[in-house]
Each structure stands twice: as C-alpha cells, then as structure tokens.
Amino acid sequence: MQHVLGGTIYKQTRKIMESNNEKELSTPEVSREIQFTWTETPQPLKEIIDSSGDLPSVVKMWLEKSAADSSPLLDIHKPLLLYKELNGVKVYCKNVTSVDLLTGAQCKDDPIVVIPLGYTGWFRLIDDRDKPLTTISNVARIMPKKILSYKLVTGYIRDQYTTNSNLAEPLHLKVDIQPGLLKVLNVREDFVRYTDHKKIVKRKLLRCLVCKTEDDTNVLLPFEAAGMFYLIEVRKSTSKHINIENIGYAYNIKDMYTAGLSKGVILKLLHGRPPSKPCGFTQILKVCDLIKDHTVIACTISENKRLLELPVAPVPLFVKALNYPHFDRHQTFLDTLKFMDKNADGYANELKVRHNYTVDKTARKVEKESKKDEKL
C-alpha cells in the first residue's frame, strides 16, 4: 500500500513469517528516497543563496536532458544540501621535493594543495636557519608557553586504572608520547613510580617538565628525554639573558598570513593531517597564490554521504528544491543535517586538492588589498 504524506512517498508493507509456529509482523518500511520538486529555471549558486536567505537549502546541478540521459550521474549531480557559506582567503601551494630545493628547479604542473586559514596544522619556513631544541632540559631552560613536539618522546602518564585508587603514590606508565602540540605547565622534581614495557614496577627520582597534550592529558617529560621541539609561544617573563633568537619556531597558516605570507615562500608541514586525496604530497609546499575564495560546503542527500566544497561562481547552474517544508522531517534529510552538524566545520578546514587552477588576477588583488590595509 502506498500513500502520500507531506509530499513524501511512504511504503508500508506487512510480511507474515512463520517460525516455530509463531507469526511475526515486520515493522513498516519507510522509503529512504525523498521526492523533490525542482524549480524550472536554473540559476548560479550565488543567486540561489541570495534568494534563500539563511542556509541550509537543497539544490541539484542542472543538466540538459540530452546530457542527463547519456552521462552517468556523479555525486555532484545528486540532490545536495547546501549547509555553510564560506568567504575567506586560501593559500594555494604546489608540492616541492628535496631535489627541487637543491637544484632550484621550478615546480611541476602537479595538483594544487589548498590550505584554508582555519587549517590546524603547524609549519616551519624552509628558509629559516634556526634549529629546534633537542632535549627537554633545553625546553625547560626557556619555559615557553607552548611547543610542538615533532618526534616521539619518552615520558610518563598516569595509569588510568589506578588514578582513582587510594595509593599514596600514583602509578605511571612509561610510554612514547606522540608528536603534537604541548602546553608547558611547570617543572616537577619527585619520585615517579611507574611500570615499563615489561610491566615491571619501578621507582625513580626524576626531574620532569609537566606538559598537557592536545587531548588534555598531563605528561611528565624527564629532562634527559631527547626529541625535536619547536617553539610556538614564549612567555613575556622569559629572561633577557636567554637567547631564543636562533631557536626554530612552528607557525599555523593563519598567523603566517597575518604576518605577511607571500608567493614564493616554501613551507614544510611539521604536524597536521595531509590531504585525503592523492596528490603526491611531499609535506614541502611552495606558495603559489593567495586567493579570496567564495564557496559553500555541501553534502549529497543519500545514504552514502559525500562532502563537497562548491565554488560560488557563474557556472555551473543549479535548480532549487521548492517543497522544503514537506521534506524537512524526512529521516534521510534529518540524517544528512545531523551529519553536517558534526562534520562540516572539520571538512571546511581540511587541506584540499585542486587541478588546473589559475588565478593570477585574483591573487594580485589579494596582495594589493593586503598592502593597502598595511598603509592604513
């Protein structure tokens, strides 16, 4: 039996199953596919967004009938939930190899790596001759606010199974602390009771730097521990007698842009997620352009959801769903909306990969406006 409810087609079936002389009724099965009603006249995304007011909105790429009949439908041709509009600068880079750096060769015409200013990774400048700190004792001598640990470093964390116990002296685990951002808290000198990789309990007097990881875990890093540590933020109270001019720093992309990042600068990604799409990623990137980008984060309205970042441009054209009040309670739509609430911001700030993109005029416009702001 089929009936129409609020513009959505629902299928209700009853199957009688006999098992062990008992009859069971199956639950009604609801159609997962939404029946949309589309506008007849296709429009650019900007016109649709301006006329819709606040997002979200539902659209579909417009195809001429001949193209729609002959071409297989891609994700972008499916109904899309427009979720979030983005206006901001992105840094366009090309992959560079160590051979390119040594020979001075030009970057190949490879895919472009796009870095949004909200990307949470950490970089260093390749031309920077400053060196990272190599021991925790050297870090403790400066006592910065934040550092980036580039490699694994041996340390101690509280054993979660004994944290709430009545032990007079807490038990720690001796582990390798993963690379990442560390907030420097204080110096502690005391006996540390711990278990090593052989599960043997030991007790040792240690002088440690107490730090907090990105997931709010307190770690004890012994002064003799070796690694590679880049400064991120130093304290105003750092002694003038301590020379920190020749120590390597790590920067996020937003701070570098604010400080005047320009074309031709070469960066190395020290810590952060690489692009999810293949692009021959080398972690060494040469800045090609600084682009003012107008995009919208979207998602396919389907069981297999795919996130997209669409340029708000004159082409391609889209048609808009007209029957919004009728499908806003459909489970597939609600699932997609929930998925975007959870994932849209993270996706917007990921490294993206683009192909065959030339925007010299736009880049010059960004540079000119930046210089104008500096004069003001």
Label every model-predicted segment.
Residues 2-376:
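Src homology 3 (SH3)-mediated interaction modules
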